[in-house]
Amino acid sequence: FADEPELRQERDRMLASGNPFGCGEDIETLDFDSYAPFPFLPPVTTGHFGAVYEIRTYKLKHGGVTPTIAAWEAAVPARVALSPLVIAMYALDGPARFTHIWPFASLDQRAAVRADSVAKGIWPPKGGPQWLTGEMYSTIALPTAISPLA
């Protein structure tokens, strides 16, 4: 969304509608999370970056958003030399957390890049893990044909 009022307007529209996406009969519940990109990152670029995407969310300790962003800002240039980053973003509502999305050619490439980044001391970002609560969720996703990341 271009700005917070536009985000709020769309959220209100979805909450008020019994059929917000043209498939209301198939929806039991909807959850909404609002995020802002880490401020040092460029805008998301669409295109084909991989066949597999990892979407990972970490819950943060109170006060952890700013130091996490700083740690990532220092570490991302070396990390993206190994594989691209779609986005890293922090939650605007709910518990303190951040989500990042990485594309990979395959699950094997994901494992190799992660191992390489740790072996080289590139990742995780120095000072970042101390702000994590230990609660993490990781999803492996395959883009559909209509995805802007397919």
Regions found by a protein language model. Give the residues of each.
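Short glycine-/aliphatic-rich beta-strand segments at the starts of folded cytosolic domains
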Residues: 52-58
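Short amphipathic alpha-helices within nucleic acid-binding modules
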Residues: 3-16, 66-70, 106-119
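Short hydrophobic/aromatic beta-strand micro-patches
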Residues: 1-2, 59, 101-103
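Glycine-rich beta-strand-turn "strand-cap" elements at beta-sheet edges
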Residues: 12-51, 82-99, 103-105, 115, ...
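A short, structured loop/turn motif at beta-sheet edges
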Residues: 42-43, 61-63, 108
